Amino acid sequence: EPPQFPNYASALTAAGAVVRFLGEEADYDGLLLPGGGDIHPSRYGAAVENCQGVDQERDALELETFRQALEAGKPVFGICRGVQLLNVALGGTLHQHVEGHSKVDGVDGLHATRAEGFVEKIYGRRFMVNSAHHQALDRLGRGLRAVQWAEDGIVEAVEHRSLPIWGVQWHPERLEEGWRCRDTVDGLRILRFFVSQCG
């Protein structure tokens, strides 16, 4: 269990979910794909240019788990690496490095975004999010549409046109009331949305 996973578990629990990790239980109502290291570029037909923390066993496990969830019609929500993974799984590609979206001195960055689709329904059209990534979505996978953008045009959220699949590039699990960064939205609201879709 990677060290960041308790953040996701506590945030999902606060949002009303009963959390299970892969391998603990065969049945589940929805799949959350969490953040982490970069996906190997061979998964989207590219050469390695700028990658950090690649774990090809994790890539394989999560891609297969996503495929199974897709076949079963389970709701899926991706966060940071997770939205990148579901994009790649659906045939999309990634920018291997973007400037201005990484942590600074170990602290999440902040930036303004504009939204539509499911994100706008939750938070409104314009709001601030945290930022802690150096890769980003490039060509979108089959059926995905962008619904949130940073001011530089980087995609911050997607939704599927017909399937229960959503993802965000930012970290709602770090935005819980009480320890979220000043001026950012309450991440529990979007996690509650996901949990509500898993009923």
Describe the residue ranges of each PLM region.
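Hydrophobic, aromatic-enriched interface-forming segments
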Residues: 83-85
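N-terminal beta1-alpha1 cap of cysteine-dependent amidohydrolase-like domains
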Residues: 1-79, 88-95, 99-123, 128, ...
